[in-house]
Amino acid sequence: MAAYKLVLIRHGESTWNLENRFSCWYDADLSPAGHEEAKRGGQALRDAGYEFDICLTSVQKRVIRTLWTVLDAIDQMWLPVVRTWRLNERHYGGLTGLNKAETAAKHGEAQVKIWRRSYDVPPPPMEPDHPFYSNISKDRRYADLTEDQLPSYESPKDTIARALPFWNEEIVPQIKEGKRVLIAAHGNSLQGIAKHVEGLSEEAIMELNLPTGIPIVYELDKNLKPIKPMQFLGDEETVCKAIEAVAAQGKAKK
């Protein structure tokens, strides 16, 4: 029997997801479809009777709005919310804002897959002349970050490395106190949590496609190890289509 339950949810489709662009730390909002995904995710949690004690999320609006929508659906908008840059999306550096399919057509799908799916290979850095450099690096929500903490690019390994301290120092104690925890975050930061919780290999985690807007449930033992595979709260067809859509990103259009 599970000692704890942990629920994760990836934000709904953003405006830049809709345009198939590398979103990174750019603060894209939810698209209309993404808002509907978040509503359906919240309804799935409501239908399953989930209640929470604390929520944790990033400082990016597409996730914050997803969380708001979920909490509205389950009528728990009063819950405390902790926001942290450590749960932000991976920083895609110089690729930020580029269309993934066009980038694949220009550089080849193999190169884009290396940038997107290699565990420890970072993309090109975001240079000061990048059109979104000031938009991100000068954003006051990051004013307290040190020069070492504020990235110009990240590999998945880097993203996991900055998310894990928050997991160990903030999330784990909440779970062990018996708090019912909901984490709303991004594909790469949630991959990091999944890798750590499940003990996945570097290769396995890079093939894990987490769907947008669909709650993911872990049942954990007293050592916070899963007693069964992650469970998606949604009908099988919807979940499969959402996973396939994520997997198809980064491919050149035929």
From Swiss-Prot:
One Gene Ontology term, aspect cellular component: sperm principal piece
Protein name listed in UniProt: Probable phosphoglycerate mutase 4
Post-translational modification N6-acetyllysine, affected residues: 106, 251, 253-254
Site feature (Transition state stabilizer) residues: 186
Enzymatic reactions: (2R)-2-phosphoglycerate = (2R)-3-phosphoglycerate; (2R)-3-phospho-glyceroyl phosphate = (2R)-2,3-bisphosphoglycerate + H(+)
Keywords from the UniProt entry: Acetylation, Glycolysis, Hydrolase, Isomerase, Phosphoprotein
Annotated NCBIfam families: pgm_1 (TIGR01258), PRK14115.1 (NF010713)
GO annotation, biological process: glycolytic process; positive regulation of flagellated sperm motility
Coiled-coil ranges from the UniProt annotation: none
Pfam families xrefs: His_Phos_1
Catalytic activity, EC: 5.4.2.11, 5.4.2.4
Residue positions where N6-succinyllysine is found in the record: 251
Note: This is the product of a processed gene created by retroposition from mRNA of an expressed gene. This gene seems to be expressed.
GN (gene name): PGAM4
SUPFAM superfamilies assigned: Phosphoglycerate mutase-like
